[in-house]
Amino acid sequence: MPQIRWGRVDRMLRPVHRWIWGDSERRVRKLLAFAEVEADGGRDILRASEVTPDPLLRRLYLAHAIDELRHADLFRERGAALLQARPARATPLSAGWLPAGDHGIDDLRVEDEPDESLLAFLHVAEKAAAGRFTIYRDVVQDDPSTRAVFEEILRDEVFHMNYTYTQLARVSPERYRQRVWRARASRLWKRYLRVAASLAGLIGTVMLTIQYFIVLPPFAWFAKRAERRESPGWTPIPRDRDRSPTSQY
């Protein structure tokens, strides 16, 4: 299998990846989330094999879809095994606001996309997945079984990355590089939107917490202080209030 190197950003985020995968419950959630992503991707690629007019791509898409569904089973089985073996304890802090790093189809409508666009997207997604799974494989040194799952899946991801690029160059020889860059830009934009939405939710939670525990208590204290100054019981109404009004003002 070709050696896949870490990127500069991934090297800087290595402690974050170790923190995420160092907790058994977070590890289980990540594996089960990967299983869902792989299964969704497999179904979409299977649909692509049904609608493509290219017989070679039909066979390759079908093999790709079978691989993705098998990956889903591997992730699901490993997650279930860790789930059964974990000790019972409180749920830790979720890392769901961090970028997931998975490689789903991102709600791509397979029926509406030509083979060139789908191949470009799959190439970019599989390349990103291969790099990210390499990171995950390297940070789970303490879990040989999970590491073996990533090793097995990585071999398929490298093949998927290579065949999609080769076929893209075949079906679109003049514009395949442009299509790859367009797919990469679209993927980065969608990731930015996901991160921005997650970050906005996190900031909103922090601001509401600050408002509840820091801003509101002084107002509650002043309200209680004003309440203590009020005399208990009914408040008498002056007699001049009983006279009939002479005008509406």
Predicted features and spans:
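Juxtamembrane, membrane-proximal amphipathic segments and lipid-exposed surfaces
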Residues: 228-249
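Non-heme di-metal
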Residues: 1-231
